[in-house]
Amino acid sequence: RVLPFYNHPGARGEDSILSTCLTDYTVKRIPVYTFHDGFGFYGSLLKGVLPLSLKKISLYDSALITDRFYRACLGWVRYKPLYTYLTQPEEYDRIMEESKERLEKSLPKVCAYFNRSEFRNLSEELQFYEKNVQSHYKEFRDAQRVWKKAVEKTVADGLVPQNPGSA
């Protein structure tokens, strides 16, 4: 019942990649409040205390914020080719061309806004991961096969019950 959590090298989006495997599963929405403290501003969360108000985050206040945003962007452009290949294979070439064009148009503005030239690397990263999408796809499928064998062996060896709710 548990599926492998695959992430190709240096990319983000492992939850999105996992979602492509859920077609034959019942996915339940559980209404819970979650809070992602991406910058470590709310230490009280670890004690179970939620903030009453949120701090305003300015892109100009901290290189940490800009660095984190840059790394997130890198992760996004790295996972886009594989995610698109998995979810829209018939439209893959068109979507990737459109994405590259839009990225090329927007990067000069992004670099100027953040006053950081390294955002230009996003275009090269997208092209690299697009070029390697077949390899990443094969790794993803290999991970699924290996995981399936491991689960089958674990069940066959009696290490876990075959129907987890029935024990």
What residues fall within each predicted segment?
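Terminal low-complexity segments of carbohydrate-biosynthetic enzymes
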Residues: 50-167
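Generic alpha-helical propensity signal that fires on short helical segments
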Residues: 30, 45-48
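Acidic donor-binding loop at a coil-to-helix junction in glycosyltransferase catalytic cores
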Residues: 11-17
